[in-house]
Structures are given as structure tokens and as C-alpha cells.
């Protein structure tokens, strides 16, 4: 554990230091289960789960308990009835990072681990993809080329959804996005019913603004980080691999890429990265990194070897 020479709100860890904070937290995840959680191109193994994610799960578990005590103290001050132990105030976790950095895998692994704690078994995961405007609306607004940028999301709907969950509504509904069809599925909904923990994963979830933003409702937040050059290479590699997986489906919006040669696919992927994903990362996503409670830093081989925890 290292503290910067200048006063800082952060504490930095290497993996050896971080894994010592696991204490006796048990590993309740099998290799078979991990395979189902691992994203395309991700290299996460059970050792990384033990050394990185179990200490993280322990930290969040402690913070969930502390947050509930804080809510109880506020209720006592206001003279309100104590909350029903079967319906605690949901703990909201934000997971942010670039396209292709592995934030979806991080969110899924975290969900699986947190749901195994007796005190918070109901853990829901929602991605902000469902809050993108439908393609027809993006076309009307001339925003198709900005898909994934902050302005391409229905931020009011996202705010209403998270506020509804946080305020203890019986249920809240999130739209569903199809990566196959590259659009919102009309009429489809993901129903969230008073979870103990809600994980919200997306590119721009740590965005701030002059008014109340969804990040203001987070109790804990993660930023999955890596060198921009490494993320670009991961994106290109994933694009190449998808020619024989997602793109191979005739129903896929990107089916035409399935017939591309390696060289054609590399050119196409790098152009998408250069014109869309990199600008969004540099202009909108990366500037939100300082807001994260914990930054997970990946090396070129996808492994997490450095972490930065916000202590203030």
C-alpha cells in the first residue's frame, strides 16, 4: 500500500498488497461458473477472482452494512419508522470504463460474488445500453454517429429508473437493448424488484452535470482502466473474433463484417475506434475516472495488477 508524497484522497495498492485484504472471504465461484461470466477476449481466471475480486467483495460488503447504519441514523433523526430489514435501502454500484476494457465481465463477476453473501442475496445488474435512444430517435436527432456518447442516452429515463430503485419502489423497469440488432427491443423490459444491491454498468455512468445525475445516487463506483493503446488492441482483437461469433448470425446488424478478411476487419475496427470509441473515451469517459471509489488498472494481458482506492 502506498500513499503519494503529496496529500491525496487515494491509497494505491499493487496486487500483492490488495490480495492480503481478502482476509477469510471464501471463494464461492467455480471455474465453470467463471467461464459463463467471462466476456469475449477476457483472460480472468480464478486466481484473479481470489486476489482481486474477493477483497473487493469484502470491501463492498462492509460498506453495505455501514450504509444501512447511516440510513437508520437518518431515519431516527427524522423520527421515521426504522426500515424493514427485509427491504433495506438498495445499495447502488456504478461500473464505468471504455468499450472493450472488460467492465461487463467485472460487473458480472461482482454480481455473482456479492449475491453469495447472506446479508444481500438479491443483486441485480443493469446495463445502460437499454437507455440508449432507439435508432429511429437517434436518426431523427442526427446522432447515429454519436451512439454511445452521453447525448445518445435518455438520461432522464435512466435517472427515473435508478431513483425508483433507490427510493424502494416495489419494482422498476429498464428497457432492453439487443446487440444483435443494434437497437432497443420494442416492448421488452428488465424488471428489478427491490434488490439489496443494484449494479449499473455503462460507459458514462460516472458523468456529472449542473443538475442531479445518476452518479450522485451511487454508494460505490468502479472504473476499469487501462492504457488507451491496449484498449484499442483489445477492441480490434474482439472485432476480429466476432466475425465467427456474433457477426456470423444472419440476423446481426453487423453481419456484413463476417465476410471481411483479417486485413479488412482490422482497417474497419481501427476506423470505428478512431472516429467513435477513442474520442468518446478521451472526451467523456476518462475524465470521470477521478470520481470512482476504486480504479482497477489492467496490464496489456488484461490482468489487474494495480488498484487505487478513494479514501476521502
UniProtKB/Swiss-Prot annotation:
Record flagged with keyword Kinase: yes
CDD domains in the cross-refs: PanK
UniProt GO BP: coenzyme A biosynthetic process
Claim: Cell wall biogenesis/degradation is one of the keywords in the record: no
Catalytic activity, EC: 2.7.1.33
Keywords on record: ATP-binding, Coenzyme A biosynthesis, Cytoplasm, Kinase, Nucleotide-binding, Transferase
Reaction catalyzed: (R)-pantothenate + ATP = (R)-4'-phosphopantothenate + ADP + H(+)
Binding annotation for ATP: 97-104
GO cellular component assignments: cytoplasm; plasma membrane
Pathway(s): Cofactor biosynthesis; coenzyme A biosynthesis; CoA from (R)-pantothenate: step 1/5
Localization of this protein: Cytoplasm
UniProt-listed Gene3D superfamilies: P-loop containing nucleotide triphosphate hydrolases
GO molecular function: ATP binding; pantothenate kinase activity
Pfam families according to UniProt: PRK
Family: Belongs to the prokaryotic pantothenate kinase family.
NCBIfam families: panK_bact
Additional note from the record: Was identified as a high-confidence drug target.
Protein known as: Pantothenate kinase
Encoding gene (name): coaA
Amino acid at each position: 500500500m502506498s500513499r503519494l508524497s503529496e496529500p491525496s484522497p487515494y491509497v494505491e495498492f499493487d496486487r500483492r498488497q490488495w490480495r492480503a485484504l481478502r482476509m477469510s472471504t471464501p471463494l464461492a465461484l467455480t471455474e465453470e461458473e467463471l467461464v459463463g461470466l467471462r466476456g469475449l477476449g477476457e483472460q480472468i481466471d480464478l486466481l484473479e477472482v481470489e486476489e482481486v475480486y474477493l477483497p473487493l467483495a469484502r470491501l463492498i460488503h462492509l460498506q453495505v452494512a455501514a450504509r444501512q447504519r447511516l440510513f437508520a441514523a437518518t431515519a431516527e433523526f427524522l423520527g421515521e419508522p426504522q426500515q424493514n430489514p427485509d427491504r433495506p435501502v438498495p445499495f447502488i454500484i456504478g461500473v464505468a470504463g471504455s468499450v472493450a476494457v472488460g467492465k461487463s465481465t467485472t460487473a458480472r463477476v461482482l454480481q455473482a460474488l456479492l449475491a453469495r453473501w447472506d446479508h444481500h442475496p438479491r443483486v441485480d445488474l443493469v446495463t445502460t445500453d437499454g437507455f440508449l435512444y432507439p435508432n429511429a430517435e437517434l436518426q431523427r436527432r442526427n446522432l447515429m454517429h454519436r451512439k454511445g456518447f452521453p447525448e445518445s442516452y435518455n438520461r432522464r429515463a435512466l435517472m427515473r429508473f435508478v431513483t425508483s430503485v433507490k427510493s424502494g419502489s416495489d419494482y422498476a423497469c429498464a428497457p432492453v437493448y439487443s446487440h444483435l440488432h443494434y437497437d432497443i427491443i420494442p416492448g421488452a423490459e428488465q424488471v428489478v424488484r427491490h434488490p439489496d444491491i443494484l449494479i449499473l454498468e455503462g460507459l458514462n455512468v460516472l458523468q456529472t452535470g449542473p443538475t442531479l445525475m445518476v452518479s450522485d445516487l451511487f454508494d460505490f463506483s468502479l472504473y476499469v482502466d487501462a492504457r488507451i493503446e491496449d484498449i484499442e488492441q483489445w477492441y480490434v482483437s474482439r472485432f476480429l473474433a466476432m466475425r465467427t461469433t456474433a457477426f456470423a448470425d444472419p440476423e446481426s446488424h453487423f453481419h456484413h463484417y463476417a465476410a471481411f478478411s483479417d486485413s479488412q476487419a482490422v482497417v474497419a475496427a481501427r476506423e470505428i475506434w478512431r472516429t467513435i470509441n477513442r474520442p468518446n473515451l478521451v472526451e467523456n469517459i476518462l475524465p470521470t475516472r477521478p470520481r470512482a471509489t476504486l480504479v482497477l488498472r489492467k496490464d496489456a494481458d488484461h490482468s489487474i495488477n494495480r488498484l487505487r482506492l478513494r479514501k476521502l
